[in-house]
Amino acid sequence: MPTKERHIAMMGYRSVGKSSLCIQFVEGQFVDSYDPTIENTFTKIERVKSQDYIVKLIDTAGQDEYSIFPVQYSMDYHGYVLVYSITSQKSFEVVKIIYEKLLDVMGKKYVPVVLVGNKIDLHQERTVSTEEGKKLAESWRAAFLETSAKQNESVGDIFHQLLILIENENGNPQEKSGCLVS
Ligand SMILES: Nc1nc2c(ncn2[C@@H]2O[C@H](COP(=O)(O)OP(=O)(O)OP(=O)(O)O)[C@@H](O)[C@H]2O)c(=O)[nH]1
């Protein structure tokens, strides 16, 4: 099968771990320092269910509830990773606002999305429950994962699940449609 190219945008509030998830996925390492992103791109070859993909990731600058949705991320993207930190209720609220804006800008009712609750290694500081995350993802018909970029927990699954959702949207169902919850 010929290799397919898929463009994925990482979005969410500041400091939730978007860059760390990209770096962990692409380079297999965790950098314990904080350098706010303006915009960064990463490329990785991934194989899912015998299909090779060139995954182009765009790591966006953190957004907040007042940000205007950056229109450039609504065009030529196949899917989105919306990230919050399980230690920040604010980041959970912001991800809901980003999702609404995304649908609005794209003029669509459905967009392939994986909702990610990151930083699960900081479980003692958790303020967003797994149940809240799951419910939100179900309401979006999105996949849901809790991850740790630091401990490399479920990071690869984000991109595998998103590639499957994108494939399903393109009329090539490889898995049962509907909500993918792990
Ligand atoms: N404990 C823990 N810290 C994390 C994790 N992921 C990221 N961090 C830390 O959180 C801080 C912010 O991480 P970034 O990856 O820069 O976050 P970002 O969402 O890209 O931030 P912006 O560029 O401002 O949007 C850094 O100090 C990271 O080391 C994680 O899974 N666990």
Swiss-Prot record:
GO terms for cellular component: cytosol; endoplasmic reticulum membrane; Golgi membrane; plasma membrane. It catalyses: GTP + H2O = GDP + phosphate + H(+). It holds the Pfam family Ras. The keyword Magnesium applies. Belongs to the small GTPase superfamily. Rheb family. It is found in: Endomembrane system; Golgi apparatus membrane; Cytoplasm, Cytosol; Endoplasmic reticulum membrane. NCBIfam families: small_GTP. Mg(2+) binds at residues 19, 37. It is a lipid-anchor. Keywords: Cytoplasm, Endoplasmic reticulum, Golgi apparatus, GTP-binding, Hydrolase, Lipoprotein, Magnesium, Membrane, Metal-binding, Methylation, Nucleotide-binding, Prenylation. A motif (Effector region) lies at residues 34-42. GO terms for biological process: apical protein localization; carbohydrate homeostasis; cholesterol homeostasis; G1/S transition of mitotic cell cycle; insulin receptor signaling pathway; lipid homeostasis; multicellular organism growth; negative regulation of autophagy. One of its GO terms (molecular function) is GTP binding. InterPro entries: P-loop_NTPase, Small_GTP-bd, Small_GTPase, Small_GTPase_Ras-type. This is GTP-binding protein Rheb homolog. Its main location: membrane. Binds GTP and exhibits intrinsic GTPase activity. Activates the protein kinase activity of TORC1, and thereby plays a role in the regulation of apoptosis. Stimulates the phosphorylation of S6K through activation of TORC1 signaling. May also have a role in activating TORC2 signaling. Residues 180-182 form a propeptide. It is an enzyme of class 3 (hydrolase).
